């Protein structure tokens, strides 16, 4: 299996934005056409790809039931190309402890991001990788989530029995195969009866229409409705959500109904969401993803204030959807080549999570960028190959324990605006958004926080 990136790249617009890129494309087209003609027999740009690996049929794993919880955890992670199930046993055990000490949501895609092609040929299933990943999730006390993406090549114009991984993230199922994709979704649901939450597709991949310069919300929604019906037929208690579309923004102003100091949202994403809201068969939650960074100027007006975008979008989604639970399937806060220290990285993440909690997000899933090799792993939850806990793991555990969905927040005053706070009856978290020591009175007590320090403090509530 050719690896898919363990971490999504910095958000890029799906349409050309640079003249230089356009000129380069023109130069390359002729060569590509000649190459394609020599290859012959390819369809929709699919190369032959590798032969999909299909082993002996395995019985469905017997998975532990998710732990009973008083509140929905709200916080969690998405497993990517490399995760704990790919690590040596000792490292996997340490990661299991990091993830399981406070049960949180854990999400896995059905194709790519660590697992192979689930149905290489029509009716021929291969769940070995997915079984392994779901088994680890259950062993680490996960509340499991599955993302129904991506789709086998034969549903997208490629060859049955082969997988062209270069097309995994760029091509959607053809309309004549929407029913086949829905059947695959139902087969997955039957394979893993302990999984009760499904997100349909990922980032509208393959649903951008260059001829109209907008998202193909009609095509996506048609596919979504078929998947929704198929999953509910397997088990009416299964929760299903979409449209899982990326919401991009720009610093420059444009015609959009949603804007703030953090930028202006691309109206085309909002239009696609509203189409889905109006034409969906049903939904148990609404899913989006996005970055605090604008496409043209990074984080504006600064790295911390830019996180206000998440709260503003969440409020808009709740209003437009009739207050459906809002899920952020991914969120990103760090510009390319930022040079941030790990302390600043985690402080900005904490600021984003405060925005999520204050705006009433039901679920926020952290895209865990684990890597294969030992060495620097910025933003990871544990050190690759060693299993040592990294700061982001503690942040997620703390928010999961103290700020699950439904917890009642309390207002806490800080005498210095550089110290952001989030509080409930029993616990307070403070974030120094400055690169300097800050002394402030918070919740009636004087504190001094180091640069970018995150500090938890008990409040003594019942």
Where are these regions (language model features)?
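Aromatic- and carboxylate-lined catalytic core of secreted/periplasmic carbohydrate-active enzymes
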Residues: 55, 60, 350-434, 438, ...
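Terminal targeting segments of Actinobacterial cell-envelope proteins
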Residues: 1-15
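Alpha-helical scaffolding within the catalytic cores
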Residues: 59-62, 87-95, 127-133, 183-185, ...
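C-terminal region of N-terminal signal peptides and the immediate post-cleavage residues
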Residues: 13-15, 30-57
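N-terminal substrate-binding region of glycoside hydrolase catalytic domains
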Residues: 54-187, 193-212, 245, 293
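Conserved, mostly hydrophobic/aromatic
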Residues: 137, 188, 198, 227, ...
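Noncatalytic carbohydrate-binding groove/subsite architecture in carbohydrate-active enzymes
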Residues: 216-348
């Amino acid at each position: 299996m050719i690896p898919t990136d363990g971490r999504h790249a910095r958000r890029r617009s799906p349409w050309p934005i640079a003249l230089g890129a356009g000129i380069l494309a023109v130069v390359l087209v002729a060569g590509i056409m000649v190459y394609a003609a020599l290859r012959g027999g390819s369809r929709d740009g699919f190369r032959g790809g590798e032969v999909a690996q299909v082993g002996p049929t395995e019985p469905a794993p017997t998975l532990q039931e998710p732990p009973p919880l008083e509140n929905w955890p709200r916080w969690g992670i998405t497993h990517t190309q490399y995760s704990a199930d790919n690590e040596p046993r000792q490292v996997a055990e340490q990661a299991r402890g990091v993830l399981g000490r406070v049960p949180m949501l854990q999400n896995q895609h059905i194709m790519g991001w660590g697992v192979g092609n689930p149905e290489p040929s029509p009716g021929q299933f291969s769940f070995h990788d997915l079984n392994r990943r779901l088994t680890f999730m259950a062993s680490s006390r996960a509340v499991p989530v599955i993302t129904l993406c991506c789709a086998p090549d034969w549903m997208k114009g490629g060859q049955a029995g082969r997988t062209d991984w270069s097309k995994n993230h760029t091509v959607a199922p053809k309309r004549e195969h929407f029913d086949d994709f829905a059947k695959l979704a139902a087969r997955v649901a039957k394979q893993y009866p302990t999984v009760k939450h499904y997100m349909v597709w990922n980032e509208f991949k393959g649903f951008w229409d260059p001829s109209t310069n907008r998202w193909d919300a009609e095509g996506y929604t048609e596919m979504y409705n078929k998947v929704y019906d198929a999953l509910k037929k397997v088990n009416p208690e299964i929760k299903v959500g979409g449209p899982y579309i990326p919401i991009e923004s720009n610093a420059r102003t444009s015609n959009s109904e949603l804007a703030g100091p953090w930028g202006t949202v691309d109206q085309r994403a909002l239009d696609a969401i509203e189409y889905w809201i109006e034409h969906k068969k049903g939904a148990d939650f609404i899913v989006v993803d996005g970055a605090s960074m604008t496409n043209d100027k990074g984080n504006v007006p600064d790295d911390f204030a830019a996180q206000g975008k998440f709260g503003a979008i969440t409020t808009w989604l709740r209003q437009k959807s009739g207050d459906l639970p809002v899920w952020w399937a991914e969120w990103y806060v760090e510009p390319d080549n930022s040079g941030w220290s790990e302390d600043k990285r985690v402080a900005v993440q904490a600021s984003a999570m405060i925005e999520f909690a204050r705006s009433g997000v039901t679920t926020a899933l952290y895209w865990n960028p684990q890597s294969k090799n030992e060495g620097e792993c910025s933003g990871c939850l544990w050190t690759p190959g060693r299993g040592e806990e990294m700061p982001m793991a503690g942040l997620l555990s703390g928010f999961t324990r103290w700020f699950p969905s439904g917890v009642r927040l309390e207002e806490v005053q800080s005498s210095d605006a550089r110290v952001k706070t989030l509080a409930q009856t029993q616990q307070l978290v403070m974030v120094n958004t400055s690169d300097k020591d800050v002394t402030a009175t918070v919740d009636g007590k004087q504190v001094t926080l180091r640069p970018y320090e995150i500090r938890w403090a008990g409040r003594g509530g019942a």
